Regions:
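Catalytic active-site module of serine/aspartate enzymes centered on a nucleophile-bearing elbow/loop
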Residues: 291-324
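Short beta-strand/loop motif that positions the catalytic acidic residue
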Residues: 260-261, 267-269
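N-terminal cap/lid segment of alpha/beta-hydrolase-fold proteins
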Residues: 8-30, 236
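Conserved hydrolase catalytic core segment
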Residues: 108-147
């Protein structure tokens, strides 16, 4: 990282110029929106979680004069319906939805941008639809391996944030703490809304308190909203107990070896990312020679930390220079 250069900042806020709801099954409707230049370089920005939903800030990583910016709320979250729904909700359905949106909007190929779980989904899409990907921009790489889930939700990150971890495990009795993800899942799928929300708040707060090393750790406002934390925690936990719905542990990294050849990409990762440690980005780079790995010395996991913002925008600008 060149610390002497001026860091790029988010582009000014831009409003969606059109939006809609796409029926993707008898059960699910997906909210989508477009911003920026209708004739620009298409990009789909994938939100995290899963279950996090899109936000207006996600549009601001792209030059609206040069990009056709597509956002969508994945199944069960944001403005998609039914809300917090776990049925028909898995990685492969989300990839099908991406293809449905692409076809609905008449896009042949697009840049795929995603952070955290968004990087997981972006990679899964790229290895199954490489002919539809112009380039990848990934942040906070998460390969959804058991070791990554155990690090953050069971044993690892607790040594760095023992205070926050104590609050996280509070809803779970001592005799169930040997498998916290399963214990949370039982509560997050309970019919008792009070019990479900108590668990959801603890789950979301844990992630919210460990996102950033920049200044005081202030949770994003939506981490205080009951509807948000309900969907966020339920859907995340649903994917984690099911191993991301991949065939085997480590499937994504194995598929990336070879199948990403020829796809240009940038991986941006905070040196002190506690949520998704740097190991996964490092291992991904080893099997993806066309990728450029940017390690940010003064950043954690959040997409809004200054060093992360700078490199993400530089990566997106570079793709626009090349393809727009």
């Amino acid at each position: 990282m060149n610390v002497s250069r001026t860091r790029k900042k988010l582009y000014p806020p831009v409003e969606a110029r059109r939006s809609g709801n796409l029926t993707v099954s008898d059960l699910h409707e997906i909210y989508w929106e477009e911003a920026g230049n209708a004739s620009g370089l298409p990009v789909i920005a994938l939100h995290g979680g899963p279950g996090g939903g899109s936000s207006p800030e996600m549009r601001r990583f792209f030059d609206p004069r040069r990009y056709r910016i597509v956002l969508a709320d994945q199944r069960g979250c944001g403005r998609s319906t039914p809300f917090s729904e776990l049925r028909e909700n898995d990685t492969w359905k989300l990839i099908e939805d991406m293809e449905s949106i692409r076809e609905h909007l008449g896009i042949e190929k697009w840049v795929v941008f995603g952070g955290s779980w968004g990087s997981t989904l972006a990679l899964a899409y790229a290895v199954t639809h490489p002919d539809r990907v112009i380039g990848l921009v990934l942040r906070g790489v998460f390969l959804l391996r058991r070791s990554e889930i155990r690090w953050f939700y069971q044993e690892g990150a607790n040594h760095l944030y023992p205070d926050a971890f104590e609050r996280y495990v509070a809803p779970i009795p001592e005799d169930e703490r040997h498998d916290l993800v399963s214990a949370f899942y039982r509560r997050l799928t309970s019919d008792d809304r009070t019990e479900r929300l108590k668990a959801a708040r603890a789950w979301a707060q844990w992630e919210g308190e460990t996102l950033s090393i920049q200044g005081p750790r202030v949770r994003p406002p939506r981490f205080e909203e009951d509807d948000f934390v309900d969907a966020f925690a339920r859907i995340e936990c649903h994917y984690f107990v099911n191993g991301g719905f991949f065939e085997e542990d480590g499937w994504l990294l194995k598929q990336a070896a070879g199948k990403l050849n020829g796809i240009p990409g940038t991986i941006v990762h905070g040196r002190y990312d506690v949520v998704t440690p740097l190991t996964s980005a490092w291992e991904l780079k080893k099997v993806w020679p066309d990728a450029d790995l940017k390690i940010i010395a003064d950043a954690g996991h959040s997409s809004l930390e200054p060093g992360i913002v700078d490199e993400l925008i530089r990566a997106c600008d570079s793709l626009a220079d090349r393809y727009a």
